[in-house]
Amino acid sequence: MAKTAASSALEDLDLSGEEVQRLTSAFQDPEFRRMFSDYAAEITDPENRRRYEEEITALERERGVEVRFVHPEPGHVLRTSLDGEHRCFVNVCSNSLVGAPSSRPGPGRGGTAAGSHWSLPYSLAPGRQYAGRNGNRYTVYDVVFHPEALALARSHERFREMLDATALEAVEQQFGVRLDRRNAKTLKIKYKGTPEAAVLRTPLPEGVRAQPEGELPGLLPYPPYPYHYPAAAESTARSPASPAPKAVQRPEPTEPRCSVVQRHHVDLQDYRCSRDAAPSTVPHELVVTIELPLLRSAERAELEVKGKLLCLDSRNPDYRLRLSLPYPVDDGRGRAQYNKARRQLVVTLPVALAVARQDFSTTPEGPTAETGTDNIACTSAGDLAGAREESADSSGADHGRKSCVVAPDAGTAKAEGELVPEPEQDFGGDSVTPLGPGEGTTPENRSLLYSAFQSGDAESLAERSGVYGDLSVQTSEEQEGTCHDTSGSDMGGPGTESIKPLCPPLQCNQDEDSLTLLIQVPGIQPQSLHGDLSPFSYELCFSTQDSGYSFTLQFAPENKLSTKEPAISISLNNAVIVLAKSPESHGLWREWYWGLNKDSLEERLFIDEENVNEFLEEVVRSPLKPARSLSPPLIEVLQVTEEQIQIHAKLQECSDPDGLQGKEKGVKEECPLSEKENTEHSTTSTADSNSSVAVEGLKINTCGAVGLQQGCPDVPHVLSGKRLQSEAKMDPEFIRESSTAYSAEEKENIKEPVITKEKKIGGDHLSSLPNKTAVQNTHDFDTIKETNMQDGSVQIIKDHTTHCAFDFQNSLLYDLD
């Protein structure tokens, strides 16, 4: 303990480098160490101490003041806390120089029986600081009474309580501190710290002693006296009459000191040079530090956190705290830690962001400025605007009409994320029916949201000042309502017509524990993102300046997503979303399903060894005659990367005896198997003189297109894929498809009737395209095989007739025909 106290005292010394060097060199001198030891022994010698007190007494008597040194005799010790920060000890001591206690009879208060009014003289010494075992400092005060007072306290319990209360009150009034009376405890020890004598100064009746005649004055004047000289005519100091004692009441539990710190997580994307980049004013965590200097263990404390209220109760010592927090917190994820060295309870509480934004948005911030002619304010309480108030704008003499689509907050929504239906409300003539439980993901219900985005509300949200919400997509557990301004319907504004959402171009890559979605749409408005995440699917809708988009992503039952909030990064040209895989589904997945909604999903394959082999088998496979046998083709994989696959296939046998041997077949795909938004098929046929040759390209620019592949025994195929260009709009191109002409013998072998069938590709019927020629695709066999180039699935069709656009690419081909 002495070592710790010495080290703490040395740490408090403010020494310069020169002083440290001089002290170091001095203590290295043996003569200096001997002299320093003699000095320490001299000042600690009791005899020298007595001589020092006699000299001080004589000097003070010459000044007309009687000085008496009060040496405290041990009594008992009170332990409490000082200003709620650290421990404090009050030594209740005795000395015969202090006045004896006295009492006088007096009437009781409030109709109580008559009693005795006590007067308890005491002497105080300034507080002294010591260092504890852990380096923590504590303060010690000495309150000295007459020995008779301590004798009465030992024999009467109520008198002892009065004596202790008087000692604590004297320290508070004299030194201006606050002691914890409720948790004051009497220790078994008799004295704490090192005893130090106090001084009692009383003026002498005769005043200052006159200087004798003939005595020369001193060369130096007396040093200034630090205390005020009392008048000689005044009598000796009397103990002030103590006020009438108050009714003895047990004090209330002590309210400990506490501090609340708001902790934010720094994210560099909040400091980009962009309108949507702004740090949120809502903190991520609240750190509450509670000072409990008398609490030895956290087992005696009871902590409860609910919503925005923190409650702490403790018995022995008695603490009671009711703290109102600035933000609602998630008590289920909070943690508390008690620091025994500092006697502090540190509680870390994550802020419930969704509830905090809703509470902040509903809190009035004073009178809002009137805008427009209707003076109606529409409040948005969702992830679109974080937490801020919006003023609705309207133009013209007529009052604008408001329509809001409001979803229940997270507290009223079900676990599956269903929306609780609300009754219809009339907002100035435009009534909106709430969405039902199963209508939240259909494109028809999303059209109202997109029409509101087109009216300029989404852009205005980013421009308004205030608290910006996180750009993270809300999960099914944190669904919040959005309110959109659709005023101007009577004026023929852009909000009068609902825009059907489009399916955006999407690329999906994977690793062992996450999926990365690349949405190649430029100009995405961050505040328009609305997502719904579940273990088996992910739905997202957003909008740009000109249009709205929506897509649904699903996976196999054995592949599950984590419900962790997705990470979203938005740039000027695209958006990247990272979805975490569930821990039990880590690894490489085989396929994924994607489409505009759940009714139009398509299967997509990830790039792995199994899918590549299956794709190669589908490419080289053709519906040949059973009697015709081909040698296995020579397949050579030139390059397999994330962005490109190059395959070289060489056939060993051709049905045409005059044809070329060893025809080469090249397959090149410039994008992953999962990215087949735009595919281009080129077919080149070489046959005898009775056959015609046609070269055409089939280009499909749609979200759910299906490519037709018709096998011919002696026709090599070249498949090439092109990455979707990131333009906002592209004019649809004509669909061109070729069919080979067959010889007369082959036409006679056709036995099955031909059935006309129209196929809808990209939303347009082929029959509606200009310059179309109906061509019957006939073959030697009863069936034909249709291969979907997007997922490799094969469909067998017995009777099939297709309508296609027929176009010649070369004038020589036209002459040959």
Swiss-Prot record:
Modified residues (Phosphoserine): S622, S631
Region feature Disordered, mapped onto this chain: 233-259, 385-404, 410-445, 473-503, 653-692
Main localization, broad class: cytoplasm
A GO cellular-component term linked to this record: protein folding chaperone complex
Domain of life of the source: Eukaryota
UniProt KW Cell membrane keyword: no
Keyword Phosphoprotein: yes
Basic and acidic residues bias spans: 386-401, 661-680
One biological process term in Gene Ontology: inner dynein arm assembly
Biased composition (Polar residues): 681-692
Localization, UniProt: Cytoplasm; Dynein axonemal particle
Keywords associated with the record: Cytoplasm, Phosphoprotein
A Pfam family of this chain: PIH1_CS
Its biological purpose: Required for cytoplasmic pre-assembly of axonemal dyneins, thereby playing a central role in motility in cilia and flagella. Involved in pre-assembly of dynein arm complexes in the cytoplasm before intraflagellar transport loads them for the ciliary compartment.
Subunit structure: Interacts with CFAP300. Interacts with DNAI2 and HSPA1A. Interacts with DNAAF4. Interacts with DNAAF6/PIH1D3.
Protein family (similarity comment): Belongs to the PIH1 family. Kintoun subfamily.
Name of the molecule in the record: Protein kintoun
Natural source organism: Rattus norvegicus
